[in-house]
Amino acid sequence: MSGVRLTVLGSTGSIGTQTLDVARQRGYTVGTLAAGRNLDLLAEQVREFRPALVSVDGSILAEARERLSGVRVIADPSEAAVAQADVVVNAMSGLIGLPPTRAALEAGQAVALATKEAMVTSAHLMWEAAAAGGGRVVPVDSEHTGVYQCLTGEDMGDVAELILTASGGPFRDGPADLSAVTPEQALKHPSWSMGPKVTIDSATLMNKGLEVMECASLYGLPLSQVGVVVHPQSIVHAAVRLRDGSLKAQFGPADMRLPIAYAIDAAPSGMQHPGDVRGARRGEEVGEHLGWPLLGQWEFRAPDLTRFPCLALAYRAGEAGGLLPVALNAADEVAVDAFLHGRIGFLDIPQLIERVLDETPGGALTWDSLTETDAWARARAQELCAYGVGGAGVGA
């Protein structure tokens, strides 16, 4: 696998830097990098991996061209996504990751997809892009690569349920009253090292809700066949229950380099339509294995939807479909940012999201309606945030 040529979109973020760890360990060539505004880290990556093409945020394009001499520098991640590569790893966070995903799939690229918003907000549009251009998709999330591995060799008609595990976040065992939770407390995830947005989503269980929606879209099952189990040890990442009663599970250490490496291995033969699971030949080990026997106690419990209503809101949006997943994603991004900056409280996050969902207009999902609904939901969420903690505009 050392001859693999990668494009890494979102290279300076958490998944992006860990992808480059995998590339470094396995000797992959990195032909293209795309980042936002973290020019210092990007410059280090360019010096090490010597890509031919780099994309940056337009606001730093002139400075980047000056500092990254000898490299072609652009301000268009979608152009970067179609550069020659064996695998495109899209680690861009948020809706800005959708156009590059679409471009890569329409260009026939093999995409290892960490941008969960692509499948949460616009799944059928992404599958249309893959069908049009011959692109392939494999997810990067540990839970979804776990499901992918469990489904390998199985007929989708034999699948009764897909099960995703959740660590439960930093507040799974307390405090009883979450109203006074601070951003600093919420950012202390017990198992995983992630970016701030995903870490807060894990604390509210919204991350698991988004993963449930993504899972249903990836594997072509209704949300009623995608379950969640809280597993504090974060060893079992996913399981598949088959119609004969058998249960297959995937487990491993809480190290994102493993699912990233598997997604890179699997992407060239990845999915072109929901549930199109073909497996992969695996590369060399990139992290420490769990060892055997596996010592210690494993716990599994049902999630508390009263304490963590964001998970229930995600099921609601996913079951409704249409434009509600777009509104959910946009409202959550605004709410999490407001919480991190002290503008609203922890418990205001689900209240704000619910208000936006209640007010979301109906309509069919198209690229235009997605963009319009995203903008509307963000603006409405910002209005609700303006009332502040405990304001009538949020909780009413």
Swiss-Prot record:
Mn(2+) binds at residues 141, 143, 211. One of its GO terms (molecular function) is manganese ion binding. Its cofactor is Mg(2+); Mn(2+). GO terms for biological process: isopentenyl diphosphate biosynthetic process, methylerythritol 4-phosphate pathway involved in terpenoid biosynthetic process. InterPro entries: DXP_reductoisomerase, DXP_reductoisomerase_C, DXP_reductoisomerase_N, DXPR_C, DXPR_C_sf, NAD(P)-bd_dom_sf. Belongs to the DXR family. This is 1-deoxy-D-xylulose 5-phosphate reductoisomerase. Pathway: Isoprenoid biosynthesis; isopentenyl diphosphate biosynthesis via DXP pathway; isopentenyl diphosphate from 1-deoxy-D-xylulose 5-phosphate: step 1/6. Catalyzes the NADPH-dependent rearrangement and reduction of 1-deoxy-D-xylulose-5-phosphate (DXP) to 2-C-methyl-D-erythritol 4-phosphate (MEP). NADPH binds at residues 12-15, 36-38, 117, 195. Its EC number is 1.1.1.267. It catalyses: 2-C-methyl-D-erythritol 4-phosphate + NADP(+) = 1-deoxy-D-xylulose 5-phosphate + NADPH + H(+). HAMAP family: DXP_reductoisom. Keywords: Isoprene biosynthesis, Manganese, Metal-binding, NADP, Oxidoreductase. 1-deoxy-D-xylulose 5-phosphate binds at residues 116, 142-143, 167, 189, 202, 207-208, 211. PANTHER family: 1-DEOXY-D-XYLULOSE 5-PHOSPHATE REDUCTOISOMERASE, 1-DEOXY-D-XYLULOSE 5-PHOSPHATE REDUCTOISOMERASE, CHLOROPLASTIC. SUPFAM superfamilies: 1-deoxy-D-xylulose-5-phosphate reductoisomerase, C-terminal domain, Glyceraldehyde-3-phosphate dehydrogenase-like, C-terminal domain, NAD(P)-binding Rossmann-fold domains.
